[in-house]
Amino acid sequence: MQALLLVGAGGAAGAVARYLLGVQALRWLGPGWPYGTFAANILGGFLMGLLAGGLAHRGGAGQETWRLLLGVGALGGFTTFSAYSLEVALMIERRAYGQAFAYSLGSVALAVAALFAGLLLARRVFA
């Protein structure tokens, strides 16, 4: 139960932070490109790396609490791209270059394809 509360609280905070970033990016830079999403994905990757490195260095008690609150919750709510980035980085560190390339390309291509499939289905169902 405590794990669910940590993930939920972190996820709520991350989602609000992403929303506010998107609002500010739109206000500052305009609607010409998805600046908010781009920034959230890059910042989320950076923060996930910082968290993973910090937790690996620190170790010990409380590590799982911080991982759940910040890694799974806050960064998961801010962007799932941060978790994806960590997974690719771990593959590269293990020298699994082919796997990292396939996962990177496949994740992006299939996510975009799935989005289009969902749009197509929604348009047919709700037309």
Curated annotation (Swiss-Prot):
Record GO biological process: cellular detoxification of fluoride
One Pfam family, short name: CRCB
Catalytic activity: fluoride(in) = fluoride(out)
Disulfide bonds: none
Binding site for Na(+): G76, T79
Role played: Fluoride-specific ion channel. Important for reducing fluoride concentration in the cell, thus reducing its toxicity.
UniProt-recorded name of the protein: Fluoride-specific ion channel FluC
